[in-house]
C-alpha cells in the first residue's frame, strides 16, 4: 500500500521496477517517489501525514525515517494514536484539520494540536467504525468516506477538515 502528500509518494520495497517506473512517469516531475524497505509494508496504515508533518509507526528504522522525511518534505515523528502504533489506520489529516480514534487521550489531542498546528477532533466512519483509514480519504479539496457513513460523521469531517469550496 502506498501513501503520500502533495510533495511525494511512498511505496513498499516489493513494488516492481516496472511499477515504480510507471508511477514515476504518471506523477508530475516535482513529485518525489521513494521506496520503503523492511518489514513494514502497509504504509497507509503506518504513516499519517499532511504537507508539514508525518506521524509514523514507532518501529520504522532511522533509514526509513530519513526517506519519509526527504520524499514527503516533512518533519517526522514516531508516535502512537490511542496507544496504537498503526497511526495511519487511526488518524487522517489534511493541511487544515485531522481526525483521530475516539479513544485518543486528552494529552494526545493537545500534543497533536500543538505539533501540527491544526484542529484535531475525534471521529468514526461507516456507522461508528474507529478504523478511520478504512473509510476516509481526504486532501485539501475533498473528502471521500465510506458509503455507510452517517450524516453526523460526514458533518464532523466537513467541520474538521475545512475543505475548500
What function would you assign to each model-found segment?
Residues 1-165:
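The feature marks the mature, well-folded catalytic cores of soluble enzymes
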Amino acid at each position: 500500500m502506498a501513501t503520500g502528500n502533495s510533495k511525494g509518494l511512498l511505496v513498499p520495497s516489493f513494488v516492481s521496477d516496472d511499477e515504480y517506473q510507471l508511477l514515476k512517469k504518471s506523477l508530475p516531475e516535482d513529485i518525489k517517489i521513494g521506496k520503503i524497505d523492511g518489514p513494514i509494508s502497509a504504509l497507509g496504515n503506518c504513516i499519517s501525514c499532511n504537507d508539514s508533518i508525518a506521524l509514523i509507526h514507532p518501529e520504522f528504522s532511522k533509514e526509513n525515517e530519513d526517506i519519509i522525511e526527504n520524499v514527503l518534505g516533512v518533519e517526522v515523528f514516531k508516535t502512537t494514536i490511542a496507544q496504537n502504533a498503526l497511526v495511519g489506520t487511526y488518524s487522517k489529516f489534511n493541511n487544515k484539520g485531522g481526525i483521530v480514534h475516539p479513544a485518543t487521550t486528552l494529552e494526545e489531542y493537545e500534543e497533536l494540536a500543538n505539533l501540527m498546528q491544526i484542529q484535531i477532533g475525534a471521529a468514526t466512519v461507516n456507522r461508528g467504525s474507529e478504523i478511520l483509514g478504512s473509510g476516509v480519504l481526504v486532501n485539501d479539496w475533498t473528502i471521500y468516506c465510506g458509503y455507510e457513513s452517517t450524516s453526523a460523521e460526514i458533518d464532523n469531517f466537513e467541520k474538521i477538515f475545512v475543505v475548500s469550496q
